[in-house]
Amino acid sequence: MLEIAEFINPTPSPLWKLARQAGVDLAVGGLPFDSVRQGEAPWEFEPLRRMKEQYEAGGFKLVVIEARPPLNKAKRGLPGRDEEIATVCTLLENMGKLGIPVWCYEWMADFNWVRTNTSKPSRGGSMVTSFDVNELPKEPTELGSISEEELWVNLEYFLTKVLPVAEANNVKLSMHPDDPPLSPIRGVGRIMRSIDNFRRLVAMMPSRHNTVTLCQGNFTLMTDDLPSAIRSFGKAISFVHFRDVRGTPTSFEETWHDAGKTDMLACMRAYRDIGFDGVLRPDHVPTVEGDSNENAGYSSFGRLYAIGYIRGLHEAVYRG
């Protein structure tokens, strides 16, 4: 069954009430970096238990963790990677004990999602984020370049260690695509950037715990037929980011959920057709009048529009 969730920080805020008032009671959470006690790490059992209970006290069930312990050494194959991998194994073991079924991770070395503008004007004076490869610095990062094949080798090493732990604890590893799906960036290869590469990931270690986060804003930059891509991955999809963009991998802007390049209704039908059983959350919403752009893409009021739009599509497809 497809259910709507929201990404909510573990510290209570007005967004908690807004989400509940919009009918959302499933939380996608981070890790409790800001609330650990002396001697604790955020991926250990007690901090995670307290975080889960805090969500529950606010009326939410924690269903996905979408944050990572430090992983750059693992991605680059540097000394210390085994220690980083061990922290991931600890996280997965504790997620299993607490009944948190999905861990969303990514394989972007050195930097995460990249934008060159976080206040591009959009509909009615709202603001969205955008990307233009020509506005990026050209020099390599301080760690230097790394090839795509090196990243594949390091990912396989990582999965060899981590996937058995995920399987033993019934936690799905859910790979998020590169954002943007473009390679290289500043000399750093990016491998989770195409439909074929995601097929390679799934085939590398076939397992119902080796899965895909279908982030629509990235996947729609990889294909002009996103509903077909959804159907092709089928049961390998464990988590969905529902958003849209306009443009190409080298130059794009994010959009309101009803104003991008993608047929969002057709996507919702595709999730129904594959029998998607998991959570979908709105992602990267516009900043609207009366809200802060300090955390661009995560405007509280913009999320309310997205939740309502998604709920309407869901009702039309699943009950229409």
Spans of features found by a protein language model:
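Active-site-proximal beta-alpha loop/turn segments in soluble metabolic enzymes
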Residues: 136-151, 177-187, 291-293
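Basic, amphipathic N-terminal segments that precede the first structured/catalytic domain
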Residues: 18-35
